[in-house]
Design a protein with these regions (language model features):
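Membrane-interface helix-loop junctions in multi-pass transporters/channels
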Residues: 1-125
Length: 125
């Protein structure tokens, strides 16, 4: 039960943060491009890389922290289902070029952000 509570609490916080980032991105960039989803997925990828390395080095891979932060917080913060819906919406509006740019940017920059998080954690260790 404790593990479920850790995931639930982290997920609730992550979901609220995702919503706030989405609102802010819509105000800054407008609704034409899913900047909020891109931002949370890139930030989440970076944070996941940083977190995995820090947990391994400083906390011995603590299962409780991993459940709270990786599964809960970052699971609630990032969103693959919204990402795929955004790609489909752009494509269905006939904006295939923008859909491809968003798809490629999300995947490539997401991987880059993950590796940047790993590198930062290793540098700070």
């Amino acid at each position: 039960m404790r593990q479920i509570a850790l995931v639930a609490f982290g997920g609730a916080v992550g979901s609220v943060l995702r919503h706030l980032v989405g609102l802010g991105a819509a105000r800054l960039f407008g609704p034409a491009f899913p900047a909020g989803t891109l931002a949370v997925n890139l930030a989440g990828s970076f944070a996941m890389g940083l977190l995995v390395e820090v947990l391994a080095r400083r906390f011995g891979g603590s299962p409780d922290l991993r459940l709270l932060l990786a599964t809960g917080l970052l699971g609630g913060f990032t969103t693959f289902s919204s990402f795929t819906l955004d790609v489909a919406a752009l494509a269905e509006r006939g904006e295939l070029g923008l859909a491809f740019i968003y798809l490629a940017a999300s995947i490539l920059l997401g991987l880059g952000a993950l590796f940047a998080g790993l590198a930062l954690a290793r540098h700070l260790a």
